[in-house]
């Protein structure tokens, strides 16, 4: 409405961030709650970062030579982070859920954790559910574990220049959580042709990419070319080793 008032002669286009994830099957978007909660309140997985996942998966398909069949995992890793499993250009699963709080560990968001932690913290901290939810969203994730920052660059600096143990733990926990989703999506896709990293962390944090791929290497046969991984560039590039079974 504000833009229509400010720019009445300009066309307006709605781009829904969840649209790319509307191809999920019911068994992937439903939660194991009473089914009427879905029918009455529309509680289901919606996902996020859809525009990014769609664009990046399309670019990867081009890089693969436009095959008829493709199995791709897109890792959109920024301050907010999500993964998606893309089969033949269509999303079949994604890590964010009913809200963007779900899924992998993020800059200041905890991602998916045991739901029973909520009432426990309410009692221990004498806080309301909304106050604990604020902690989940704004004081957790990389920030909560490192005690330094929600920015991976600050954590990387503390790790390599100061040897900070919490910075090390943050990277290890982050990579382990992301690699779990990669393993899950490998199974759902029935194999894997490529893993794509995008967004601020995915494109720039070489050490986190290495930790993530190292976690997956034995199971998936995926390996990085260390020299290619270390290069910072705005261009799409292959950073996997020539003998890797999966392109990165």
Positions of PLM-derived features:
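Conserved phosphate-binding loops in N-terminal lobes of ATP-dependent enzymes
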Residues: 1-14, 18
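Short glycine-rich phosphate-binding loop at a beta-alpha junction
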Residues: 10-13, 189-200
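Glycine-rich phosphate-binding loop of actin/hexokinase-like ATP-binding domains
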Residues: 23-122
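Beta-strand segments within the central parallel beta-sheet cores of soluble alpha/beta enzyme folds
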Residues: 71-75, 130-139, 194-196
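Catalytic phosphate/nucleotide-handling subdomain of diverse soluble enzymes
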Residues: 87, 93-128, 134, 199-232
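Adenine-nucleotide phosphate-binding core of ATP-dependent small-molecule kinases
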Residues: 134, 141-145, 152-188
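Internal helix-turn-beta structural module
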Residues: 168, 172-192, 202-248
